[in-house]
Amino acid sequence: MKKLILSLVTVATLCGLAVQAEDKPKTETNVSNPSNDEVAVITTVEGTMVLEFWPDVAPNHVENFKKLAKSGFYDGTAFHRVIKGFMIQGGDPLTKDDSKQSQWGTGGPGWKVKAEFNKKSHVRGVLSAARSQDPDSAGSQFFICHDRATFLDGQYTAYGKLIKGDEVLEKINSTQTGPQDRPVKKMTMTSVKIVPRAEALK
């Protein structure tokens, strides 16, 4: 399995979003009637974040995330890539296994989701799909913007936003990192649940 890195150029800064590569994956499309009354509750070693979804602009990405979360796919994964002032990235199932650290950033669910580029801007707290150079290569990996990153607009599929737990985003983004922007302390997501909005915000 080949690790793919998509380089992003903004002014004189070169940033990379490591994404998964799957061998001849099938494509998930045509999801019908996703609901917007559910949110994602991501419990991490640094606290809990709640994210709302935008099914009106990215229905397939929303439903893909929900399906993976409801199956327990994300439980025990980690935010394996943290770039201060930019974003935190997670969703790779390989991060459950510390013996596979050299492969972190290459894992996925075994299928791809076609791009749903939209007019939502990549500002702080926005949830977006990580991908390779192929626009239709998103799978399970995602990132949450720590700061405005409008140079990603129209190139990455934004499909939700942080609505509770901004201090947790700050803690994770501030953690010490080493080579490959990997946190020194493992930023594990102990659970990722899909629950009614009212329940998550009470």
Identify the meaning behind each predicted range.
Residues 4-8, 16-202:
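Cyclophilin-like peptidyl-prolyl cis-trans isomerases
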